[in-house]
């Protein structure tokens, strides 16, 4: 039996935290007070062969940063608050064309905006006004699109393939971002599963970039294998060629306050890695009421040009992102 028709649901969560002063005194708090609201709504339609839905998630967060005044003017204080709004839209659909062919499509858009609001106050009179100091008022905004489509095709009982295409686009702007940069790529991927015998399963895969705003490898391969050694013991071995391009934040975002001085590095290169994992699982006990399994696993990772945060070699006490050779 499969239910058909429209469906709707939603949720609301409110988190309030008064902060924690810790070893600080006066108005200052080690953990800043926070007021956070999370809302979501979803509606869609489904029947035996199709499921289509849209979902909206909304975050409204206020982090308050009260400070003490100076020793000479304790009544004059400067407070810094962080106001964040984030909208995430998701549209997804699944179609079952027949017993051997399924199609999946997804589209997502996120709009993130964070405002830094600095206010000056006179505690003796209650007067309050916005600070006019440099960089005291700031808005940072990120927008991101992700579109993805895949096909699951069961060609035979022992063989299936999953081709797909994915597009990603991200843009940032604000007083702490150098210009209005964007990063985008269009990639094609293909994975398969082959079970020539009951005791062996092979899952090869490859991803290639058709268009990219950065240097990308021609192909990113991976392979997963599973060996059924006995009725109660499995061996899994896998290899994956890792690739990660630098994010907008790592490339262009600058963040400076009393505790941090971090600058982006537009000269970053993508990082690469070779990743090997293996595990042996043994089912010690398997009954209707009790399942007991023990697993021994290991891994080996070899990174090249790994992106890491380190001290700026040109400016003391400042940090930036660098590629570590190995």
Model-assigned labels for residue ranges:
Residues 15-103, 111-143:
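Flexible loop and strand-edge segments within Gram-negative outer membrane beta-barrel domains
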Residues 21-27, 71-77, 86-88, 127-135, ...:
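Extracytoplasmic loops and strand-loop junctions of Gram-negative outer membrane beta-barrel proteins
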Residues 33-37, 83-87, 141-145, 180-186, ...:
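Residues that define the transmembrane beta-barrel architecture of outer-membrane proteins
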Residues 3-20, 59-66, 107, 111, ...:
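Surface-exposed extracellular loop regions of Gram-negative outer-membrane beta-barrel proteins
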Residues 8-10, 41-43, 54-56, 105-107, ...:
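Membrane-embedded beta-strand positions of outer-membrane beta-barrel proteins
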Residues 3-6, 49-54, 62, 99-103, ...:
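Repeated loop/turn-to-beta-strand initiation elements of outer-membrane beta-barrel proteins
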Residues 77-92, 96, 140, 214-215, ...:
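Outer-membrane beta-barrel signature, preferentially recognizing the C-terminal barrel domain
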Residues 1, 41-45, 91-95, 147-153, ...:
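Residues on the lipid-exposed face of transmembrane beta-strands in outer-membrane beta-barrel proteins
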